[in-house]
């Protein structure tokens, strides 16, 4: 699997260039039939896996799925955390699910597809589990790129704000 030919700075810049004001909620742009199929697959991933934090998703993900976590979720030294293979990604979802008091709310602001790659700009909202009544609502902006292979998600590059915003 080849790496996405963008530096971290270029990927973040690309995410910032997609203007929020011009994008209606869940706006999707696809140039061909295969683009539309890729967008539909990524939308299903958000609806059926990310929002409910479902950990069984082999029907949507390639067995050799690679997920790169940049920003929040990255290694302590700031380098991307790379999860290789379905078991590693499932284990990560299990870990995330254990930290949240309620399902994650994901608002997709924009999806753009070209060929087998889909770019997504979104916001995650969730409640972290705390001790006692110390649960706090949080929000994070994310940009992600999804590579589709054989009708399944094969590679995810996820760029997430390292410092979430606290909601009241």
What residues fall within each predicted segment?
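Short beta-strand edge/turn micro-motifs at domain boundaries
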Residues: 139-167
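Hydrophobic pocket/interface hotspot
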Residues: 42, 56-57, 65, 85, ...
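A short hydrophobic beta-strand element
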Residues: 116-124
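Short, surface-exposed coil-to-beta transition loops
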Residues: 104-107, 123, 137-143
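Short, low-complexity N-terminal intrinsically disordered segments enriched in polar/charged residues
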Residues: 2-5, 15-55, 59-63
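Short, cysteine-centered beta-strand-loop-beta hairpins and adjacent loop/turn segments enriched
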Residues: 99-102, 126-137
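A solvent-exposed, acidic/Ser-Thr-rich amphipathic alpha-helical stretch
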Residues: 59, 63-114
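A short acidic/glycine-rich loop-to-helix N-cap element
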Residues: 31-33, 131-137, 164-168
């Amino acid at each position: 699997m080849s790496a996405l030919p963008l530096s971290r700075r270029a990927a973040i810049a690309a995410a910032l260039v997609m203007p929020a004001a011009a994008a209606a909620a869940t706006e999707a742009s696809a140039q061909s039939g295969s683009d539309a199929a890729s967008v539909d697959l990524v939308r299903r991933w958000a609806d059926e896996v990310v929002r409910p934090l479902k950990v069984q998703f082999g029907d949507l993900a390639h067995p050799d799925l690679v997920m790169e976590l940049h920003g929040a979720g990255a290694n302590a030294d700031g380098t991307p955390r790379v999860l290789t293979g379905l078991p590693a990604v499932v284990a990560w979802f299990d870990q995330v699910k254990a930290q949240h008091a309620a399902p994650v709310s994901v608002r997709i602001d924009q999806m753009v597809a070209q060929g087998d790659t889909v770019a997504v700009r979104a916001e995650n909202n969730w409640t972290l589990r705390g001790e006692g009544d110390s649960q706090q609502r949080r929000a994070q902006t994310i940009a992600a790129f999804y590579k589709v292979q054989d009708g399944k998600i094969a590679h995810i590059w996820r760029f997430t704000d390292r410092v979430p915003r606290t909601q009241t």
